[in-house]
């Protein structure tokens, strides 16, 4: 295991967009629904290994918490950004991938806009909770080459490069990263302290989680629209 380093609010990104009046995503309803499954599918549990209350963040979801809560996800080709306000100890995690499309890698392409949306939803929810841009600590994980039949598309590498490019374009510093490779990862993030533990999964125990990621990838490819999507405004 590698170590880096009130109320939890797991939500769908579609709900977050609907809550921001005057902001239109330009995505189809199907794409927005796929971006984050319903909040009910993000599971709260007690983690006996770490003796902590925890919340699972599944593919397409994000969660923001102001409590002493551990956020947990399993990543294959998807990526997660773990973001916290170092002063307030509030933070959040997302779990997403870019839809596969036969297009250029421009940051303005439809699938790249989809990734931008996933990142901006998380950041906006943190800003609304009181986080400040200048106090953000950001660590990113995932992007492994693990999805069967998709390795030739460099899905994981594409996702990892996207999140790094997004943060660079936004002028946000990456404090730590663990990207690419061929092994799935289980990420444990405690926003209140900034502690992150990453376990590389080298067995088949993560098959169920990776199956859900593959299903998520399939839905993305079918639901993403080529209609231009507006960037969300970042509130700082």
Curated annotation (Swiss-Prot):
Cited CDD domains: CheD
UniProt key word Hydrolase: yes
Enzyme Commission designation: 3.5.1.44
UniProtKB keywords: Chemotaxis, Hydrolase
GO molecular function, one term: protein-glutamine glutaminase activity
Region span, Disordered: 1-20
A UniProt-annotated Pfam family: CheD
Record-linked InterPro entries: CheD-like_sf (IPR038592), Chemorcpt_Glu_NH3ase_CheD (IPR005659), Cytotoxic_necrot_fac-like_cat (IPR011324)
Tagged with keyword Hydrolase: yes
Stated family: Belongs to the CheD family.
Biological role: Probably deamidates glutamine residues to glutamate on methyl-accepting chemotaxis receptors (MCPs), playing an important role in chemotaxis.
Name this protein carries in UniProt: Probable chemoreceptor glutamine deamidase CheD
Organism: Ralstonia pickettii (strain 12J)
Organism placement in taxonomy: Bacteria, Pseudomonadati, Pseudomonadota, Betaproteobacteria, Burkholderiales
